[in-house]
Amino acid sequence: VGADNAQNQLLMGALQTAMPTLPNIFEMAGDRSLMSLALKGDAKMAVGVNAGIMWDINKQWSLGFTYRSKLRMKVNSGSIALKTIDDPAIGQILGQLLQAPQFSTLQNLSSAVVKTELPLPASLTWGVSFRPTPKWEFAVDLQYVLWSAYDRLDVELVNPTDNTTVMTLASDKNYSNTLAVRIGGQYRVCDFLTARMGMYVDESPVSSDYLNPETPSMTKLAYTVGLTLRPTRWLDIDLAYGYVNSADPERTGSYPYTNSVLELAGVGAAQATTDFSGNYTARAHTFSLGLNFRF
């Protein structure tokens, strides 16, 4: 609760109906959030299918295709904690407000359990590799990810006693299907050493109207290098480094956010909804180590 000045003014008016002598706690809090919800839960095991086929056309060309099915990761008994600002004076005021009838829902949150599910999208991948000489190999992969399965996220806060819904935190996602392109090459220097280099472009499934800090939310451009050391006939050591950056230096967008406390206070849904805007950039350094044993 907090952040948007227009909504804060609406909420102050609603709160003062419950406590007419209420001081302006938003001014007292400054940039700090008055209340927040901390949700925690472990997803149940989900079962999916991976299937693929490889065709070695000749010694130079190979084609491949893989399919990965969609999974739905479900959380049925997550926990929730209602946290208030670390300020004794404001905390005392909030404690009194939570006793008001219109905020009775908030009183029941700490004993509620979290139920939600998150889809992991299906994907289709096509690949081709070309070996012009015994030492050189080049490859191209196209991966089509069916992100449209992630159209919304509903988090239900449920009373465990009678299994009734205390509150639903609903958010539209409206993800779009995406295409990722990966290209790379490797050179076998000798029996002991193989060197690799590559890059990929991974399209963002999120439109600017629904841009938020979650991942994946930006089109990513990555460069990779790696090598394989083969000290013995039965052991390979793989080392790799990748630099991931956003395709745009900075991406600007917004996300429709509904203030649930405003709705509880009786403010209409239209007034309780505002845009959470921001400018985003992303970069990462990745390192990997792999060991392959042959028997």
Regions picked out by a protein language model, each given a short descriptive name:
Residues 1-295:
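Outer-membrane beta-barrel porins/channels
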